[in-house]
């Protein structure tokens, strides 16, 4: 913790503010990033306040509005104006993973993954506007599963709420970009604890909240998912790595996704940036080995890497042994 705090405090001074733009400070940095990301989603997905938009395919690598997105789920996006209450219903979908992730403008959040109707108010959520992301599991390689995932998306119902428009300060995007780069570099070097970074106000640690709010924006709270975001020692894009996992204690699923030096998925000839325990080919003993780099020889479950790459392990709906630290994900090691 002492090292992390020192590095944050010694980060480069933010760039000079643009005329008429709202200055970025350590106190408002996460708020500014959240407002920026909400605007980015509005533009990227053509959102209108109060209107849900379904993405029918996994994220387009040419249009990644947020760093470290996943390709295990398809997204449905919604921006709420909570000047009036909203009701959201999650459908019964035969056990398929689907979650509703509510993020206020301060990046405090909560998640629900149980079918039912939820009433949201400005008082409960904490800010007038909120971003809501629905994640629905999909296996893109299975046409029947794709159809079922789309039906699950269509079952989400939203009613009530104000009509906007979305309002936020005109934050200095130049300063924000400098701060984002510094904290992304920090997270890649020494990581942060997602269990202490994401949650309601009062549930998070201020340092991990600051780093996670930039390097892992829109990450799920611990009971929804645990994120292991890090970089290996030799992430030169040439040294291959691998990890083997078996009997991972989650109630939903787990995955490994690879990102470039800027935190985005990099297009590659294999068209592969991720594997999860459904899409990966298992070993004879039921374990799963995922390779990172060295894909030219056709090794199984291989994800290409680039210089400066990092990874995110996602553990969806982790069980007690993950949350209390008695079980840890296996180490990612170099491959000879």
Located regions from the model:
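Gram-negative bacterial Sec-dependent N-terminal signal peptides
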Residues: 1-21
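A compositional/structural signature for long, glycine/proline-rich flexible linkers
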Residues: 20-336
């Amino acid at each position: 913790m002492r090292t992390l705090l020192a590095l944050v405090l010694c980060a480069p001074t933010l760039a000079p503010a643009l005329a008429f733009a709202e200055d970025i400070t350590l106190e408002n940095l996460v708020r500014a990033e959240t407002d920026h990301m909400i605007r980015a989603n509005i533009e990227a997905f053509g959102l209108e306040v109060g209107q849900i938009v379904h993405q029918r395919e996994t994220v387009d690598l040419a249009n990644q509005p947020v760093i470290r997105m996943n390709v295990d789920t398809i997204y449905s996006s919604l921006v709420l104006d909570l000047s009036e209450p909203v009701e959201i219903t999650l459908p019964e979908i035969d056990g398929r993973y689907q979650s509703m992730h509510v993020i206020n403008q301060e990046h405090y959040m909560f998640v629900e993954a149980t079918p039912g109707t939820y009433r949201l108010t400005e008082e409960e959520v904490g800010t007038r506007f909120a971003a809501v992301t629905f994640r629905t599991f999909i296996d893109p390689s299975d046409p029947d599963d794709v159809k079922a995932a789309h039906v699950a998306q269509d079952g989400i119902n939203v009613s009530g709420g104000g009509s906007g428009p979305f309002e936020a300060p005109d934050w200095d995007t130049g300063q924000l970009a400098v701060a984002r780069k510094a904290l992304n570099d920090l997270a890649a070097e020494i990581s942060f604890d997602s269990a202490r970074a994401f949650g309601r106000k009062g549930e998070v640690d201020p340092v991990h909240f600051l780093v996670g709010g930039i390097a892992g924006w829109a990450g799920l709270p611990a009971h929804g998912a645990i994120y292991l975001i890090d970089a290996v020692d030799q992430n030169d894009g040439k040294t291959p790595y691998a990890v083997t996992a078996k009997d991972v204690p989650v109630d939903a699923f787990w995955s490994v996704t690879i990102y470039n030096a800027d935190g985005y998925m990099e297009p590659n000839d294999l068209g592969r940036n991720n594997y999860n325990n459904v899409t990966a080919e298992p070993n004879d003993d039921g374990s799963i080995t995922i390779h990172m780099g060295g894909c030219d020889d056709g090794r199984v479950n291989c994800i290409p890497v680039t210089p400066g790459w990092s990874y995110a392990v996602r553990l969806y709906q982790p069980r007690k042994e993950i949350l209390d630290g008695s079980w840890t994900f296996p180490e990612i090691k170099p491959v000879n």
